[in-house]
Amino acid sequence: MGFAKYQEDIVSRYVGDLAMRSTKEPASAPKKPCPSASNESDQRINKMSSLKKFAVATPRPLPVIVLADTSGSMGENSKIEALNAAMKEMVSTFAQESRLRAEIQVGLITFGGKAQMHLPLVAAHGVTGVSEFQAGGATPMGAAFDLARQLLEDKDRIPSRAYRPVLILLSDGQPNDDWEAPFNALCNSERAQKAVRLAMAIGPDADVAMLKDFANDAEAPIFKAHNARDIHRFFRAVTMSVTTRTASQNPDTSTAFVVPPPDDDALDLDF
């Protein structure tokens, strides 16, 4: 009987201890499930998609680069005055164009006495005024070709995302420097080959053969300006061609180059 009583006491104390522990130790809180990596990735994607709805697409640049003869002979018969007026009209029209897909940029290279950047390549809408060309000096066209090639190949000025550039060459005379090598280097450069190249011969003394070699658009052969009015007509055609590209679904697509007819009531003497 003594041993049985001893076992009973041990069992009683063990059961009592268990009961006391169950009342003292609080129940542990349920563990929260850890988010899976896939859930976190989905959340990030959803946030990025929401931000894209509010992002504004940056228009791609469409460079228009003019190489203008400003030599002494351009000061005759109001040629330089007509050129100045036509340039201002073109840049002003470009500045008002929509920039939804393409942003027109304008750069002006002059060659008269020396070749120089008259207007660095800038967005047309940011041009507040174009200083007038002054006629004087000889015709260093080769140096102008070098400047144009360097500008075209400058990836900081004309990034790879830019639309096809427009190159415009106009002259009323013959180059008087070593121009053939720079001319070939420009025309054979990768970007110049892809560019739309337009040319205008002003007056009877222009180097028509060289200007024809420069122009590469079968739809826009060399334009011959016989008077000041023709200079305006040429640049209006340039303006229409470029602005039509900016409004199209694909501004890289070439557009028709149509020179408007002369005004019947406008009297103008030939150069």
Predicted regions and their residues:
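Von Willebrand factor A/integrin I-like adhesion domains
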Residues: P204-D252
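Acidic, polar low-complexity linker/tail segments
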Residues: Q7-Y14, L18-I65, T70-E81, E153-S160
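Short, charged loop segments at secondary-structure junctions
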Residues: K114-L147, Q174, R191-Q193, A220
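VWA/integrin I-like adhesion module and closely mimicked acidic/polar interface patches used
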Residues: G173-D217
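Short beta-strand-loop
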Residues: F3, A102-E132, V208-N216
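Short glycine-/polar-rich loops that comprise or flank the Walker A/P-loop
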Residues: P61-L62, R164, Q193-V196, D217-A220
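Extended acidic, low-complexity intrinsically disordered regions
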Residues: P33, G203, A228, N250-F271
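Von Willebrand factor
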Residues: V56-L119, V166-L170
